Curated annotation (Swiss-Prot):
Role of this protein: Transcriptional regulator.
Binding residue positions for Ni(2+): 80, 91, 93, 99
Cofactors: Ni(2+)
Single GO MF descriptor: nickel cation binding
Signal peptide start-end: none
Domain of life of the native organism: Archaea
Protein name: Putative nickel-responsive regulator
Protein's organism: Methanococcus maripaludis (strain DSM 14266 / JCM 13030 / NBRC 101832 / S2 / LL)
Family from the record: Belongs to the transcriptional regulatory CopG/NikR family.
Pfam families: NikR_C, RHH_1
Keyword line: DNA-binding, Metal-binding, Nickel, Transcription, Transcription regulation
Keyword Transcription: yes
Cofactor note: Binds 1 nickel ion per subunit.
Keyword Metal-binding: yes
Length: 141
């Protein structure tokens, strides 16, 4: 049997309710198993992102609560620190509380990962998704 550690976490009520619906829908035996599965998925994504190398082009999509203190200013300042990677940005109002920014990037994969990590860690950021491709003629036929 695998050693297990018991942990405690705090979640917003609506987030847990939505997660519980998915647990039931997918037929998990327990909430713990669903959380373990979610953590495994997160670890796989993290390893994939951090294994990228070389020149890449892609997008960083960010959803954030624009009422969160200084979040827009912090995101803008971070983007200015990586201006050599950023080709363009698109800003969209999703609803009264949330905005989405799509940042088009091209450059070294390591620097793109670094930029993504900095954007992700900001308070008020709800979700970040990095999508990258190999630019130019390096696409398999």
């Amino acid at each position: 049997m695998v050693d297990m550690d018991r942990i405690s976490i705090s979640l917003p009520t609506n987030l847990l309710a939505e997660f519980d619906e998915i647990i039931e829908e997918r037929g998990y035996a327990s909430r713990s198993e669903a959380i373990r599965d979610s953590i495994r998925d997160y670890l796989i994504k993290h390893k994939w992102i951090h294994s990228l190398e070389g020149e890449r082009a892609g997008t960083i999509s960010i959803i954030y609560d624009h009422h969160s203190t200084d979040v827009m200013e912090k995101l803008t300042n971070i983007q200015h620190d990586y201006e050599k990677l950023i080709v363009a940005t698109i800003h969209m109002h999703l609803d009264h509380d949330h905005c989405m920014e799509v940042v088009l990037v091209k450059g070294d994969a390591g620097e793109i990962k670094e930029l993504t990590d900095k954007l992700t860690s900001q308070k008020g950021v709800k979700q970040v998704k990095l999508t990258v491709m190999v630019p130019g003629g390096n696409i398999p036929q």
